[in-house]
């Protein structure tokens, strides 16, 4: 599966900013190529029900669907993949449980990036590129830290953390395969329009 093209514009849900299903539909209308369902500490049943609806929408728009952390939910709703952080299920165990899922690894340093690649991650979510309101205590790697990771690994890299319309071009020029955003889309009044704005710049730079 050549999923790299679908990592260009990767939108992550945040219910503190917007309800999931309506905002995902608007992001897809605006050109999102991947959606990640991220809800911390939600009941499993609720995640399953929301995930089922997002799966329908992503199928309709030809986008990839990822679930943050929860392999069980990803499998239950027939998601394309799962995103795993350093405190989540180890990549190699996730691969045994779900051999057909695309596994993304969240990495915060060059060392973590190389380790995740070695353990079999399909792509990396690398950051935080800039300070971010979504995760205030996260380490900032900056543009240079991101470029180091891009140059060191062979698997696709998606940049995350504080990315917006003002800085997205600079991020894309590091050679990343895509960008992941939360606030730049979910924190705006018009989700569709915000997504369209990012998509235009991505198409200009990445083609």
Curated annotation (Swiss-Prot):
Keyword Transferase: yes
Gene Ontology molecular function terms on file: magnesium ion binding; thiamine-phosphate diphosphorylase activity
Amino-acid positions noted as binding Mg(2+) in the UniProt annotation, renumbered to this chain: 69, 88
Essential cofactor(s): Mg(2+)
Cofactor note: Binds 1 Mg(2+) ion per subunit.
Pfam annotation, one family: TMP-TENI
Catalysed reactions, as listed in the record: 2-[(2R,5Z)-2-carboxy-4-methylthiazol-5(2H)-ylidene]ethyl phosphate + 4-amino-2-methyl-5-(diphosphooxymethyl)pyrimidine + 2 H(+) = thiamine phosphate + CO2 + diphosphate; 2-(2-carboxy-4-methylthiazol-5-yl)ethyl phosphate + 4-amino-2-methyl-5-(diphosphooxymethyl)pyrimidine + 2 H(+) = thiamine phosphate + CO2 + diphosphate; 4-methyl-5-(2-phosphooxyethyl)-thiazole + 4-amino-2-methyl-5-(diphosphooxymethyl)pyrimidine + H(+) = thiamine phosphate + diphosphate
GO cellular component, one term: cytoplasm
Pathway it works in: Cofactor biosynthesis; thiamine diphosphate biosynthesis; thiamine phosphate from 4-amino-2-methyl-5-diphosphomethylpyrimidine and 4-methyl-5-(2-phosphoethyl)-thiazole: step 1/1
The keyword ATP-binding is assigned to this record: no
Residues that bind 4-amino-2-methyl-5-(diphosphooxymethyl)pyrimidine: 36-40, 68, 106, 135
Assigned EC number: 2.5.1.3
Highest taxon of the lineage: Archaea
Binding site for 2-[(2R,5Z)-2-carboxy-4-methylthiazol-5(2H)-ylidene]ethyl phosphate: 132-134, 162, 182-183
GO biological process: thiamine biosynthetic process; thiamine diphosphate biosynthetic process
Record's keyword terms, sorted: Magnesium, Metal-binding, Thiamine biosynthesis, Transferase
PANTHER family noted in UniProt: THIAMINE BIOSYNTHETIC BIFUNCTIONAL ENZYME, THIAMINE-PHOSPHATE PYROPHOSPHORYLASE
Function: Condenses 4-methyl-5-(beta-hydroxyethyl)thiazole monophosphate (THZ-P) and 2-methyl-4-amino-5-hydroxymethyl pyrimidine pyrophosphate (HMP-PP) to form thiamine monophosphate (TMP).
Family from the record: Belongs to the thiamine-phosphate synthase family.
Protein name: Thiamine-phosphate synthase
Organism: Pyrococcus horikoshii (strain ATCC 700860 / DSM 12428 / JCM 9974 / NBRC 100139 / OT-3)
Annotated gene: thiE
């Amino acid at each position: 599966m050549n999923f790299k093209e679908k990592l260009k514009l990767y939108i992550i849900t945040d219910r503190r900013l917007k309800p999931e299903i309506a905002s995902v539909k608007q992001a897809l209308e605006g050109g999102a190529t991947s959606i990640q369902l991220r809800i911390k500490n939600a009941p499993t049943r609720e995640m399953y029900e929301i995930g089922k609806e997002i799966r329908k929408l992503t199928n309709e728009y030809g986008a990839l669907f990822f679930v943050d952390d929860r392999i069980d939910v990803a499998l239950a709703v027939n998601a394309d993949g799962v995103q795993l952080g350093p405190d989540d299920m180890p990549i190699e165990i996730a691969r045994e449980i779900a051999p057909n899922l695309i596994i993304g690894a969240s990495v915060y340093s060059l060392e973590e990036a190389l380790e995740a690649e070695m353990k079999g991650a399909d792509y990396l979510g690398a950051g935080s590129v800039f300070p971010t309101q979504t995760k205030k205590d996260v380490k900032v790697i900056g543009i240079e830290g991101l470029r180091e990771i891009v140059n060191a690994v062979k698997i696709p890299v998606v940049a995350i953390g504080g990315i917006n319309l003002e800085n997205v071009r600079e991020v894309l020029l590091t050679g990343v395969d895509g960008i992941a955003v939360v606030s730049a889309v979910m924190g705006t009044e018009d989700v569709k329009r915000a997504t369209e704005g990012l998509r235009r710049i991505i198409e200009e730079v990445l083609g």
